[in-house]
Amino acid sequence: MATAVQLVLDAHDPAALARFWAAALGYQIQDPPAGFESWEDFLEAQGIPRERWNDASALVDPEGKGPRIYVQRVPEPKTAKNRLHMDLNVGGGPRVELDERRRRVDEEVARLKGLGATDERGAIERDTEYWVRMNDPEGNEFCVQ
């Protein structure tokens, strides 16, 4: 049996970064526990001080297939390249003609830029591969391929 995985992202503003990744991946912010209309209601009921309400956020695949992503506040800024990054596979893979993969990737890159991502280096093409390195709004690297 495979082990379930949760990805964890460090952030300065967990709520904002969670919203970005939810939109980027087609995920949704995790619902509050049963019996609570909102996370604010839950946190208030737990006695969590208001200044800590943005200490963390989580997003989930609405179909339940992908991993949960937990976004946690950290005090230090990002200072180096990620040791692990996500690849967003939107091109369709090697069975799709390269020109069509380029079109799909470029279209997704434009959408992600509209959400606040930045293009790190422009498109990279090697043999039959095509991808774009990007940064999320807090500088975490990811690729679109």
Language model regions located:
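Residues that cap or flank secondary-structure elements
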Residues: 9-10, 100
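Hydrophobic small-molecule pocket/channel-lining residues, especially in calycin-type beta-barrels
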Residues: 52
